Amino acid sequence: MWLRQSSGGGVASAGHGGPLRQRPIDAATDCDPRACYDSFCKHWQQAFEIIQHSAPPSHDDVLGVVSHLDYMVTLLLVELHHCNKVSLPAAEASGPPAAPCLEFLLSENLLDKLYEWACTTGRYANAVRLEQLKLYELLVSHSRHQLLCHEPFLRPLLKILASSQGEIFPPDLEKRLVILLNQLCVVLMQNVHLLDLFFFSAQTQVQEQILNGNVAPPKSGTTTNFIIFSLLIPYVHREGSLGHQARDALLLCMALSQKNSNIGTYIAQYSSICPLLVTGLGGLYSRLPNSIEISSIDWHRITPDDVTEIPELTLFMNALEFCNAVVQVAHEMIKQQLLDFMYQGFIVPVLGPAILQTLKGKHFQTNIDSQISAMSYLDLILRSITEPGLLRAFVRFLLDTEKFDGERILDALVERLNSPDANLCMVTMALFDTLLGLHCEDLMLELLLKFMLPGKHVPISHRHKINKIDPYLNSSEFFLDLSPDVMKRARDLARPKSVHEPVVSDLTPLPSLPSPVMSKTIGANWNYYGVHTGDSLYANIQAYLFEAHWRIAQCQRDCLKWANSYRYQKWPRHGQGRVHAHALELARQFFSEFGGGPIAANETSEKQLDSLQSIGESSGYESFKWRPADEESEATDTTLATTASEADLDHNSSSLSSVLGASSKREAWRTSNNNRNELILTDLEFSEDLFAQGTVSLGPFLNAIWGKLQTFTSNSLYVNLHLTGLITRLAWYPLPLIHSLLLRSDIAITSDTPSFHQVLRILKQQIDAELPVTEDSLEIIDVARSSLIDREFRLANARKGNEGSPMHHSQQQQMATNSGQQQGQLRSAYATLSAATPVQATPTSAYDPFKRSDNKRRSISKSITSMFSRKSASNTSTTPPNGSSASSGLSQIYAFFTGAASNLVGTNASTDGRGMSHAQTSAGTCETSLSTQPQAGAPRTGAIATSATASGSNSSIAGSTLTLSAQSNTTTHSASTLHGLDGGPSTGGFNSEPASLDSVASMGIIASTSGTERSRDLALCAVLMDEWLKELAAIAQEQSVVLVTEQGSL
């Protein structure tokens, strides 16, 4: 135990030259119990003679007593070390005591006499108090709880603790005091029945000290005091080990409040811990950097490595994690008080103004940096906290309209999705990815569902399909067909065909295209430069399916805890509920009087009615299987529809009651605060307006997302990574409304903006028009794909390298107890997936961009070939630390795709259409990548497509869009780095390799070629879109299975 080592070390190091203190204390042959007892008594006798002096003690007197106490502590340590059990004075019936020195200490009240003398030592009081604390620390650590039951030990201990309140001690004395308090908390946690020993009336205690002549008269209004907790409060915000030990002890006290209501009442009503924690948290937040230094082009969130590198952020996160732990373990009164103080004293007055920053004067760039830092801090907070109470407070903060003059924080965040600044846009999308990962009902309602529930964005003829999932609909094929033609052609060339296999292609064969052979960048073994890529997830549909199944199941579990089930229903207009109920009652009376069992007959007639082809629309409603009046044909029997609606209305009313009754038992922070009836009648307008078709809005959030998606080919690569990841996050929700919007190709959408499927078709047409299927286009696609795959393995290798770091080991030790088993299951699952991907042969490609001698090359291929030949002739390459050759053309190709060549030749600083900045430099500074490590419990998936998602939580790396996208988690909270991933500085292209001058000239020619920059952007977009569509196809397939299963259980 570290406590025992600390106490032993402390005793051994505080001596004044005594020889016994330097010798081993566990050698049984070195000490005679009788001799130890005699020596102990002799030392006390000499010390007591000094104590009995009537004059104030001098310096020599204090040194003498401290020296004797030093020897006494050593003798006690020797005795206790060899005693298996501490013998108490009252327990000795016969025979010699097992611990005679300890018995003498208690029977003669040595501790009480020592305390009384220490109060008279004046300026030497701290030195004497230090020796006393060492003595108590020794006895508590070795005797556990037995001595606390005896007054000769407990009484002077309470006295010295009470006298320490409000005092300012030197560091060594503070350290000993906090260690002693920590030990007492551990003992009390194991022996809760001793808690009342440390509750004493301050009035009684002070009066008792007045009788001894020690302190001034007490103040009026003194109450019961928990002395241990009171002494720990001043150290709650201390740095270093002292603060950590104090916070650990305070958490033990908070946990004790769950077992003893007196502790909880005292902390909540009489202590100042809650306002102290909140004010300290606000002060630490104010010390955070106003702008974060962004060292890479793809930076989008704060990682654990960033926290350790910024001391102010480390202190803030320590305080935040302590507040989260207090809410987790404390008494309900303490928890509620802390949450109220957090919301009123930190979240609203501190975070609110920091996030709602606006442009002021000429400080636009500074303001953008401040917004980025504030949103990054909010994202870090949401990923770090785990308690539902705190999460509920932050959700309330995002949706509050009263605290900020009618402006909601959530609306301000949505507006920043349209920001032209790439960094602000990526940080905003990363924040929304964290928010969507919370699976919170209120957030989803405000962002999406309240705009989709009326169903006005779907034509009337298609609305019956929203809740009804067709098991034979192949949405996966729809998404695969949206892949750009150049990507389809590349797949056809990469697919090894059998001799007897007919060639089926929807493309017109081009005579100039090469023969259908496999490219070196396709398959599971892209190892042209010696990099093992057998575990590549590129184009691994099994990995996509596994990831989709895992994510959808996780999301479904959380959504089952919601208060409302969000399915499309046609609700009555305002004020029509009573009219409909009255009409139904009249119909019931009519059929009961004249019908003679009409209900059963009507149910049979309804089944026959639903079987008609022309009236199939009404059968699609899952909630109400009756035909609304405004959708019925004139030939429909009104009586049948009315009777059927009555039966189903009663059924749905009972189902709604059961849902609302069970919602109180679910996680409150995930569930909505709105009652369903209030939501329907007050917040949402479900009236049917046929003239509103084509002008219905899906809400500002989806409009912003669709707007960004429409500029897909002009966005930067990293913005597109986060954008596709965010849409994929939405596609994981197993809700029919969201499923019909994103993954249903058979449902038309009529809104004021193009639908998701329409935008995808437009992007396909744009890429097909600007990047036709030619040999040069296939070469560019091949190079783009190779660079993305290479980055996937570079990130994977960086993760493996980080796994060997001490920081990673410490983090893994903390996560091992919670996620070891789950990680093992995921690794085995992915090992199966990797094994299922066979290693393929890679025959030479006729359009291989790495081939050095081919006279048929045109445009880009000629430039690459000449570049390679000049590179080989120069023979000036060096070998980088990662083992890949710097003389290879890979770094130059990466520079070609990142625009670094123009920088290397000294071009002016510019910013391309995708938002990538190019600095004016001759050293060649290029973009760096962001390495991330997978969170516990989250699989690594996505081929070159993994999402930029967090967890959190709970946030994790396994997700949607490319492995190039970076992410961290959590909440629970993953480790990543924002600097160079190859062990060197964060400079260079994708491979962080230096470029030579002769290669610079070649790259300058390529970069200046007309259309080259646009072509490379389109190539990256095509590869990204192709992989994203594969992932959407996998999600659509898994969602259909989940929703069809759910539909069958209704």
UniProtKB/Swiss-Prot annotation:
Disulfide bonds: none annotated. Pfam families: DUF5917, KELAA, RAI16-like. Residues 808-826, 918-935, 968-977 have a biased composition (Polar residues). Residues 872-888, 941-954 have a biased composition (Low complexity). Coiled coil: none annotated. Residues 800-827, 865-888, 911-954, 968-995 are annotated as: Disordered. Keywords: Phosphoprotein. The modification Phosphoserine is found at S498, S805. The keyword Zinc does not apply. InterPro entries: FHIP (IPR019384), FHIP_C (IPR045669), FHIP_KELAA_motif (IPR045668). Belongs to the FHIP family. This is FHIP family protein GE18198. It comes from Drosophila yakuba.
